[in-house]
Swiss-Prot record:
Organism: Synechococcus sp. (strain CC9311)
GO molecular function per UniProt: rRNA binding; structural constituent of ribosome
Biased composition (Basic and acidic residues): 74-88
Assigned protein family: Belongs to the bacterial ribosomal protein bL31 family. Type A subfamily.
Function, as annotated: Binds the 23S rRNA.
SUPFAM superfamilies xrefs: L28p-like
GO CC annotation: ribonucleoprotein complex; ribosome
Keywords recorded for this protein, A-Z: Ribonucleoprotein, Ribosomal protein, RNA-binding, rRNA-binding
Known partners and oligomeric status: Part of the 50S ribosomal subunit.
Xref: PROSITE patterns: RIBOSOMAL_L31 (PS01143)
Stated name of the protein: Large ribosomal subunit protein bL31
Gene Ontology process terms (BP): translation
Ranges for region Disordered: 67-88
Length: 88
């Protein structure tokens, strides 16, 4: 037999909330569960693609340490190889 009064309170109709809107109910130990993404707005399930506003780690590293962006570094390498090929 399980010990009495040691288990958390069970809420059989806990509300799952996404962007201020109740999207579903489920059983949980919390009365409300706030989520950022669920199957109704996830790009995989909706078939849409969102463009995120985050920059890549390499770009951030290059900018942080004063090396310019990745595009600048590759274009500098190309121009250097073009100049050496023109000299010969």
């Amino acid at each position: 037999m399980p010990k009495p009064d040691i288990h958390p309170t069970w809420y059989p109709d806990a509300k799952v909330i996404c962007n201020g809107e109740v999207v579903m109910t489920t059983g949980s130990t919390q009365p409300e569960i706030n989520v950022d993404v669920w199957s109704g707005n996830h790009p995989f399930f909706t078939g849409t693609q969102k463009i995120l506003d985050t920059e890549g780690r390499v770009d951030r590293f290059m900018r942080k340490y004063g090396m310019g962006s990745v595009d600048n570094a590759t274009s500098e390498k190309k121009s250097a190889t073009d100049e050496t090929s023109k000299e010969s």
